[in-house]
Regions:
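Alpha-helix capping/helix-boundary segments
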Residues: 9-10, 75, 97-98, 115-116
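Histidine- and aromatic-rich ligand-binding microenvironments
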Residues: 6, 35, 91-92, 113
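Short, well-structured N-terminal submotif of metal-dependent ribonuclease cores
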Residues: 1-34, 44-61
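Active-site neighborhoods of divalent-metal-dependent phosphate/nucleic-acid chemistry enzymes
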Residues: 65-110
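Generic structural signal for small/hydrophobic residues in well-ordered secondary structure
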Residues: 6-7, 20, 42, 79, ...
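Acidic, PIN/NYN-like endoribonuclease modules and their adjacent C-terminal/linker elements
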Residues: 1, 99, 103-130
């Protein structure tokens, strides 16, 4: 596994953004994962949509080939370390959970939120929208 998709990247894929779809088609699904927090955010967005049933089906289809990574003990330890390192200029809690999973698993986080995530020590970030 190489890449962990942030929620914003998943949303762009669900909205059929060409640059994201091209990158996803160019890599093996075995190399791409989402954190359980991202999965939760996607499900919440589906429930909030104008067409919850259709949105839930789209989310399920999108997630089907991808590994879902839990917030495990290693991620919890990285979370504490990163939260301490960022205490003077913290990032959002959900973003910190996602970043912690990426760091714990040694994965590159694919996000459009480069400004926020670039401050996270030991986290490699890529943007696939170009």
């Amino acid at each position: 596994m190489t890449w962990l998709l942030d929620t914003d990247t998943c949303i762009d894929a669900l909205r059929h953004r060409p640059s994201i779809l091209r990158r996803l088609k160019a890599v093996s699904p075995d190399d791409v994962a989402v954190a359980s927090m991202t999965e939760a955010e996607l499900w919440y967005g589906a429930w909030r949509s104008r067409d919850p049933a259709g949105a839930r089906q789209s989310v399920a289809s999108f997630l089907a080939p991808l590994a879902r990574l839990p917030f495990d003990s290693e991620a919890a330890e990285r979370h504490a370390e990163l939260r301490f390192a960022l205490r003077a200029q913290p990032i959002g809690e959900r973003d910190l959970v996602i970043a912690s999973v990426a760091v714990a698993q040694g994965l590159v986080l694919v996000t459009h939120n480069f400004r926020e995530f670039s401050r996270v020590p030991s986290l490699t970030v890529e943007e696939w929208t170009a």
